[in-house]
Amino acid sequence: MIRVENVSKYFGERQVLKNINTEFETGKCNLIIGKSGSGKTVLMKCLVSLYTPDEGFIHFDNRVLRHLNKKEKVNLRKDIGMLFQGGALFDSMNIEENVMFPIRMFQLSDYKTMKKRVDFCLDRVNLKGINNYYPSQISGGMQKRVAIARAIATQPKYLFCDEPNSGLDPQTSIVIDQLIKEITHEYNITTVVNTHDMNSVMEIGENINYIHEGQLWWKGNSENVLTTNNQELNDFIFCSALTKRLKK
């Protein structure tokens, strides 16, 4: 579990996160949603240590992020898998090298063991046998699945996904959502997804955190998100659905 305790963040005199308190549960898909400029991306960056909160604490189970020394932060980083917006594969590396990259970076295994782990992860995302391909030789949806394989290569306890369906068609987005949800449940990972895609909210939103103007305005799940009386959230849902319809 990840617990956010009284977290605030400032850029100069502007407060972009205002006393956020929430929990991201283990074995569930925890979503951070909100309009552009709401603070959801800033919160995500605080969780993965790209930003440091000016106030408050972030707890990774029994580890408090602010209190960790350099070695302890490296050990925590080994427990974190990242799925970046767009996938962020290395074009100069083949698929096997891309998936193997985080294992090599943390020197977690010998080559034979790493190779076995890569094969397992690619098989898990239904991409068996593409080890020697390069990212430019496969589709965008396949690239995203490779990115998921890379994210789970180190057997993480925590998985962070930043707009995982960005640039994907609706059918491929459903596949990616289902894969993230399956992996979360199968490996009992604490998964945090930053998204504005309402299809993702309905498909995998087991613990939804709606951020508005830097504050946590609503918390719930996909079963009650459409019946809430929160006007700001209702406006967000309507605008998201309208935007998606206009893009078709």
Name each model feature, range by range:
Residues V48:
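Helix-to-loop junction immediately C-terminal to a conserved catalytic motif
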Residues G56-V64:
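Conserved ABC transporter NBD signature motif
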Residues Y111-G129:
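Conserved ABC ATPase "signature" region
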Residues Y134-I138, M142:
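Conserved ABC ATPase signature
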Residues A153-K157:
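A short, proline-enriched helix->beta-strand linker immediately N-terminal to the Walker B motif
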Residues L159-D162:
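Catalytic Walker B motif of ABC-type/P-loop ATPase nucleotide-binding domains
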Residues P170-T172:
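Helix N-cap at the start of a conserved alpha-helix in ABC-type nucleotide-binding domains
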